[in-house]
């Protein structure tokens, strides 16, 4: 994964969850699993985080170069070819929106917010087209607008 702190935190959470699950949900008649068995569960939980291999993509370069940005948008709309990182984004985007980016790395969360702010503020037509595909309820836009109005209210 590349983020030892993240793995360590997931490992601690996984261990607690695994211990709670084995304590609370023991099936009658089956032996209680040994205390050393949370390892497979920890691996499954770590696997749930999105791959970080594209975390170092230069978002500013993409957002500031019309041709690059349009290529990404076309990929996400399904009207153009996808680079490997855009393809991965297209695959995980529905889940990331549905789960409020809970599986995102810190860089991915920051990048998602940055790109979303840019599209909503600077390219509303593109945002509306993508929103119809990935967030028809407008949930993310509503959250962003609420956050933006709160930030404007604060001194």
UniProtKB/Swiss-Prot annotation:
SUPFAM superfamilies: Chemosensory protein Csp2 (SSF100910)
PANTHER family: CHEMOSENSORY PROTEIN-RELATED (PTHR11257), EJACULATORY BULB-SPECIFIC PROTEIN 3-RELATED (PTHR11257:SF12)
Source organism of this protein record: Drosophila melanogaster
Cellular component, GO, one term: extracellular region
One matching Pfam family: OS-D
Domain of life: Eukaryota
Protein name (Swiss-Prot/TrEMBL): Putative odorant-binding protein A10
Segment forming the signal sequence: 1-29
């Amino acid at each position: 994964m590349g983020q030892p702190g993240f793995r360590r935190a997931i490992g601690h959470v996984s261990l607690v969850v695994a211990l709670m699950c084995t304590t609370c949900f023991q099936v009658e008649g089956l032996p209680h699993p040994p205390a050393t068995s949370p390892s497979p569960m920890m691996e499954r939980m770590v696997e749930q985080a999105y791959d970080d291999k594209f975390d170092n993509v230069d978002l500013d370069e993409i957002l500031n170069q019309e041709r690059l940005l349009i290529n990404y948008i076309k990929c996400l709309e399904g009207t153009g070819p996808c680079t490997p990182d855009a393809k991965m984004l297209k695959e995980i985007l529905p889940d990331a929106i549905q789960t409020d980016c809970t599986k995102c790395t810190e860089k991915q969360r920051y990048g998602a917010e940055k790109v979303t702010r840019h599209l909503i503020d600077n390219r509303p037509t593109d945002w509306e087209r993508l929103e119809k595909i990935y967030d028809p309820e407008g949930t993310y836009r509503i959250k962003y607008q609420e956050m933006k109005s709160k930030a404007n209210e604060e001194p």
